[in-house]
Regions:
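Extracytoplasmic thiol/disulfide redox context detector
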Residues: 1-137, 151-154, 158-183, 199-212
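Short strand-coil-strand connectors
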Residues: 35, 189-190
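Short, solvent-exposed loop/turn motifs
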Residues: 38, 192-193
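Short secondary-structure capping/turn micro-motifs that flank functional sites
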Residues: 130, 191-192
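Short, hinge-like loop/turn segments at secondary-structure boundaries
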Residues: 138-142
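Conserved, helical-rich catalytic subdomain that frames metal- and/or nucleotide-binding sites
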Residues: 143-150
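Short, exposed beta-strand-loop hairpins at the edges of beta-sheets
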Residues: 195-197
Length: 212
């Protein structure tokens, strides 16, 4: 059972950070999470493999369901009014991004987002770094939020000092509530979540795979 697998792993490999152990449809095989990746384990804790489990009778990818289930949030939890909205083309694809202006991976992501077509991007400014808080508020209070954000994160150009009522504290509370411990965090329209910088091709592949 699940407890047996957990104890065997803990006893033999105490430094292995495995979580969310579950039974699968295949007797003696268990799914789990390791570094945000779905893995499979034998009950004795001696074997582990990574890959897709396919149910042959209907060709259903059971691993895909696990990935979605364990890496998703409810899109309706996102207060879109607290994000900077950028629309490109017809805006049919939708993406939310939690981003810190001083995060190097967020800076890597921005040029990739620029390559996307027909997309609506909601940028939640999420200053995990203390030095990012003031400038995050200034971006929100700028006359053109989207332009100011791009200038800051891509070129390091800080906006003119401004103050106004802003959602930065709410964004921090929301991110912590949702368990967002790193940036950038990307959320797709069905709630599927990815952490870290991704290429435009990777984002487009997710849209295609999930029918978004």
């Amino acid at each position: 059972n699940v407890d047996t697998v957990r104890e065997n792993i803990k006893k033999q490999y105490p430094n292995l950070k495995i979580s969310n152990i579950q039974k699968t449809e295949m007797p003696g095989l268990y799914s789990a999470n390791l570094d945000q990746q779905i893995i499979y384990l034998g009950e004795d804790g001696q074997h582990m493999f990574v890959g897709s489990m396919i149910r042959l009778k209907d060709q259903k990818n059971l691993t895909k369901d696990l990935v979605l289930g364990q890496n998703s949030i409810d899109w309706k939890q996102l207060p879109l009014k607290d994000a900077i909205k950028t629309v490109k083309g017809n805006g049919q694809h939708v993406l939310a991004v939690f981003s810190d202006p001083n995060c190097p991976y967020c800076k890597q992501l921005e040029p990739e987002l620029d390559k996307l077509k027909d997309v609506t991007i909601y940028t939640f400014i999420y200053p995990l770094k203390p030095q990012s808080i003031v400038v995050s508020r200034q971006v929100w209070c700028a006359p053109n939020q989207s332009y100011s954000w791009k200038k800051l994160i891509e070129q390091g150009v800080k906006p003119t000092v401004a103050s106004c009522t802003n959602p930065i504290d709410r964004n921090l509370e929301l991110g912590k509530k949702l368990g967002f411990n790193g940036t950038p965090t990307l959320i797709f329209a069905n709630g599927f979540k990815l952490v870290g910088a991704r290429s435009a091709e990777e984002i487009q592949a997710v849209w295609k795979e999930l029918g978004l």
